[in-house]
Amino acid sequence: MGRKSHQENVDNVPHEHRVHRAGSWLPADHRVHKSWLEKIIENAKVDPKDLHPVLKEFKKLIEENTRIYMLVNAMFDEIPTKKPYNQDPVGHKQVRDYPHMLELFNYILTHAPEWSDSEYGIGMVGTPVNAILDWPMGTPSGFAFFLDPDVNKMLKKVLNAWGEYLASPESAYVLGTDSYGWFSEHGVHDLALTANVGQTSHKFEELFKCDPSKKHYGYQSWDDFFTRHIHDDKRPVASPEDDNVIANACESKSFKVARNISARDRFWIKGQPYSLIDMLNMDPLYEQFVGGTIYQAFLSALSYHRWHAPVSGKVVKAYVKDGTYFSEPLFEGVGDPSGKHGIDEGGEKTGQGYLTVRNY
């Protein structure tokens, strides 16, 4: 009997536990999310370590800034002590407060994303921090906290510290063939299945540049594996001589196509209309795109993760604008002014339009 597809597994999840997760970055069954978080909490508890220097800096910022101290405490207080927000029958929250949050971050900073043979999905993949913050993100104080410029400067440092670990040889331990390794029977099968997109039946090593005879298939780190190269002949460019054809920049799934885009719009409201001025950071170039079409896609967790130019041409300007990391729109949380919503369990999906701006 063959391994079930991701969609078949999702279809078998009871409705009350099912969450739509674009790109499979978080499991479709919220029970898997809770189980994973329980494991991280237990691991961090049984093997406590001194806080990473960047987290000591974060703790100092929280405790020496009255505004941030108020918001971080309030966002945990605002999580309802009822299902599905609590994990146990007496209403205890899984992540209790900001010291507990930092303790879990501390564990994450020295661990790479593991493969999961869970029946309902592939585990947390690249969003374990999002999983830890899932509930506080959707509270009114969480909304303010994750928009705060000082908080986001600190979160950037935290994520960069994790990035350094993921680029180190120590992170390659998850590239084994055991049940938590990405080259386990199910892991390598699902990676190849995704890359074959239902049209071919190539093996992983036939699709991607690697050496199966070497340890970890020759990949030196988690980052080396995650940004693996594909064999050129497996992804020919569509109509390279025809300028009317725009290729996908990466192996992404369509999220939204919007036409007749306004120069500026209320991107934070339900429906998440695109706002060119804010998307392009006030750059005068926005004027060229008013009334045009925006195509937004979502990259799958299992897909090929290198980017290619969607059109031919010459890059004349490029820049990076710092923004927010875990901000989600209020209409998807208990902060919804209408009072009709609980905290969104799939914020990384429902906030996709909103996060095209997030550069405050």
PLM ranges: what are they?
Residues 264-294, 319-360:
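Cytosolic, membrane-proximal regulatory domains of ion/volume homeostasis and mechanosensation machinery
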Residues 297:
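Cleft-lining beta-strand/loop regions that shape enzyme active-site pockets
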Residues 76, 80-265:
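Extended, domain-scale alpha-helical bundle/helix-rich regions
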Residues 237-251, 300-323, 335, 352-357:
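Short, glycine/small-residue-enriched coil/turn segments at secondary-structure junctions
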Residues 255-258, 263-265, 306-308, 318-319, ...:
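Short helix/loop capping segments that flank catalytic or ligand/cofactor-binding pockets
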